[in-house]
A protein has these predicted regions:
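N-terminal Rossmann-like NAD(P)+-binding subdomain of aldehyde/semialdehyde dehydrogenases
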Residues: 1-80
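Rossmann-like NAD(P) dinucleotide-binding subdomain of oxidoreductase/dehydrogenase enzymes
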Residues: 75-140
Length: 140
C-alpha cells in the first residue's frame, strides 16, 4: 500500500491508537536491539560496543520520547474565540545519512507516527542494513 493511500486511514488514528502503536514498536525494538547493533556494526564498521551502547539506544530514545510527548499533547486548543486544531500534514519524505543511521531514522519516523503522518523513507545506500531491520520491526 502506498504512503498516500495509507495516510487516509492512519491520519484518523486516535491519540490512544498512536500511543499503542508506539508502545508496540518500542517493545519489538527492545527485543531486536542485538540484531540492530549487529547490522550497524556490519554496515558502517562501528565497534559492537558503540553500536550496542550508543547507536541502538539512541534510536529507541526517540520512540520513548515521542510516546511521552504524545501522551501529554493537545491537538486542539482554544485561543480567544477560535479553536486551533493540529492535524497530520500528509506523507513525509525522509532522507537519512549513513552516519548514526538508526538514530537519524528514528528521530524522523517516531514524531511522524506520533503526529499521524505516513512516510517514505530513503535510507543511505551506503548503510541500509539497519533500515532493513528497522522496517521489519514496523511490520508488527
Amino acid at each position: 500500500m502506498s504512503a498516500k493511500k495509507a495516510f487516509k486511514a492512519f491520519s484518523k488514528f486516535s491519540k490512544q491508537e498512536k500511543i499503542e502503536l508506539l508502545e508496540n514498536i518500542i517493545n519489538v525494538y527492545k527485543k531486536r536491539m542485538p540484531e540492530l547493533a549487529s547490522a550497524i556494526t556490519t554496515e558502517m564498521g562501528a565497534p559492537i560496543t558503540l553500536s550496542t551502547k550508543a547507536q541502538v539506544p539512541s534510536g529507541l530514545g526517540h520512540f520513548i520520547q515521542a510516546k511521552k510527548t504524545l501522551e501529554n499533547y493537545n491537538f486542539e486548543k482554544e485561543i480567544n474565540s477560535s479553536l486551533v486544531i493540529k492535524e497530520p500534514v500528509g506523507v513525509c519524505g525522509l532522507i537519512t545519512p549513513w552516519n548514526w543511521p538508526l538514530n537519524q531514522i528514528s528521530c524522523k519516523v517516531a514524531p511522524a507516527l506520533a503526529a499521524g503522518c505516513t512516510m517514505v523513507l530513503k535510507p543511505s545506500e551506503i548503510a541500509p542494513l539497519s533500515a532493513i531491520v528497522f522496517s521489519d520491526i514496523l511490520k508488527l
